[in-house]
Each structure stands twice: as C-alpha cells, then as structure tokens.
C-alpha cells in the first residue's frame, strides 16, 4: 500500500479508537462505515476507496434500511472486472 493509503487508513483507525467509542452507535450497515472505508482503500487504493467510502457514508441515514453491504471487488483491468475466460486455473 502506498503512503497516502496508509495515512488515510491511519486517520480512519484514529477515528475508530478515539471518536467512535464516545459517539452513539449509528451506522446502519455491516461492516460499519469506517471499516468499509478501510477495506475500500485497501482494495481500490486511496482515490477509489475514498470515493466508495464517501458514497457509503452518504447512504448511511435514517431513511435507509442498511444491512450487509460489502466492498465491491477490485477491478483487475482498467474499466472492467476480470473476465471468466481470464480467470487463473
């Protein structure tokens, strides 16, 4: 992981350790929005992961039912997911 991604994950971890315990639990999703953002940054890099994390936070409100919402798989080729014909055997 590059230094920017590590720094961003470090900031999220600080939030989880310092702020999250004193705030009331309000995330409607599993995994929590902060865990989702960390996983997204790990899977998609700092830019793509941050974008996915922000979109997730915008969906986390009282009018959304929430539930299980995993990070989408990372693309293996620019602009698309791995084709079944290119899966390693």
From Swiss-Prot:
Chief location: membrane
InterPro entries in UniProt: Membr_insert_effic_factor_YidD
Coiled coil ranges: none
Any Pfam family: YidD
UniProt key word Cell membrane: yes
Record carries keyword Metal-binding: no
Bilayer disposition of the protein: Peripheral membrane protein
Cellular component aspect of the GO annotation: plasma membrane
Subcellular location: Cell inner membrane
Segments for region (Disordered): 69-89
Keywords: Cell inner membrane, Cell membrane, Membrane
Stated role: Could be involved in insertion of integral membrane proteins into the membrane.
PANTHER family assigned to the protein according to its UniProt record, in alphabetical order: MEMBRANE PROTEIN INSERTION EFFICIENCY FACTOR-RELATED
Family the UniProt entry places it in: Belongs to the UPF0161 family.
Stated name of the protein: Putative membrane protein insertion efficiency factor
Organism: Paramagnetospirillum magneticum (strain ATCC 700264 / AMB-1)
Species classification: Bacteria, Pseudomonadati, Pseudomonadota, Alphaproteobacteria, Rhodospirillales
């Amino acid at each position: 992981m590059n230094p920017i991604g590590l720094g961003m994950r470090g900031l999220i971890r600080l939030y989880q350790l310092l702020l999250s315990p004193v705030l009331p639990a309000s995330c409607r999703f599993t995994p929590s929005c902060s865990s989702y953002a960390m996983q997204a940054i790990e899977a998609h890099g700092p830019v793509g992961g941050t974008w996915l994390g922000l979109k997730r936070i915008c969906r986390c409100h009282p009018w959304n039912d929430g539930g299980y919402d995993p990070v989408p798989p990372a693309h293996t080729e620019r602009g698309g997911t791995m084709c079944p014909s290119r899966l390693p055997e």
